[in-house]
């Protein structure tokens, strides 16, 4: 199995504690409100909401209902850290065993947040991930984040 890690960093005008609460603790209710035409349901398949929990997130894309399996790896409220993996569904390419997202929030400019993100792609073989799949995944992730950010700014 190959392991490939990518680092990213961005800022948000939303305060770190507010943003963390929305994406790590209240995501099951915030995401459907931020994207009401896309998100259909969030269902716990296994676990109690803590590390090890697997959620099935159903959404509409191109007129079809699709899903992704999201596994919570770790929650670090004290340091505003959250880690999850995509372990199944349409967001997991056939060449990947899982894709892990580690995020850490801290104070950013003007009362906002600095978000550090590490994405680790665990491939089934030794081949690196497909560049087009990575770009498409990042674009979807960015648009989801911007929708949540806009929702939080409009609903303080």
Curated annotation (Swiss-Prot):
Query: One Pfam family from the UniProt entry?
Result: Bet_v_1
The source's superkingdom equals Eukaryota
Q: State the conditions that upregulate or repress this gene.
A: By fungal elicitor.
Question: Alphabetically, which GO biological process terms does the record hold?
Answer: abscisic acid-activated signaling pathway; defense response
A single cellular component GO annotation: nucleus
Q: What name does UniProt use for this protein?
A: Pathogenesis-related protein 1
Residue stretches spanning the membrane = none
Q: Does the keyword DNA damage apply?
A: no
Q: Which Gene3D superfamilies match?
A: 3.30.530.20
Q: Which organism is it from?
A: Phaseolus vulgaris (Kidney bean)
Report the GO molecular function annotations: abscisic acid binding; protein phosphatase inhibitor activity; signaling receptor activity
Q: Which PROSITE patterns match?
A: PATHOGENESIS_BETVI (PS00451)
Homology family: Belongs to the BetVI family.
Kindly state which keywords UniProt assigns to this record, in alphabetical order.
Pathogenesis-related protein, Plant defense
Chain segments annotated as coiled-coil in the UniProt record: none
InterPro entries tied to this protein: Bet_v_I/MLP, Bet_v_I_allergen, Plant_def-hormone_signal, START-like_dom_sf
């Amino acid at each position: 199995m190959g392991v490939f890690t990518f680092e990213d960093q961005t800022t948000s005008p939303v305060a770190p504690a507010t943003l963390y609460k929305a994406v790590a603790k209240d995501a099951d209710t915030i995401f459907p409100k931020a994207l009401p035409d896309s998100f259909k349901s969030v269902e716990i398949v296994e676990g109690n909401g803590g590390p090890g929990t697997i959620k099935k997130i159903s959404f509409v894309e191109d007129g079809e209902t699709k899903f992704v399996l999201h596994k919570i790896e770790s929650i670090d409220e004290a340091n505003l850290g959250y880690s999850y993996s995509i372990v199944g569904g349409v967001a997991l390419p056939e060449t990947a065993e899982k894709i892990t997202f580690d995020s850490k929030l801290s104070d950013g400019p003007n009362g906002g947040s600095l978000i550090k993100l590490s994405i680790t792609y665990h491939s089934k073989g030794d081949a690196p991930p497909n560049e087009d799949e990575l770009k498409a995944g990042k674009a979807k992730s960015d648009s989801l984040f911007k929708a949540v950010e806009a929702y939080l700014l409009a609903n303080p």
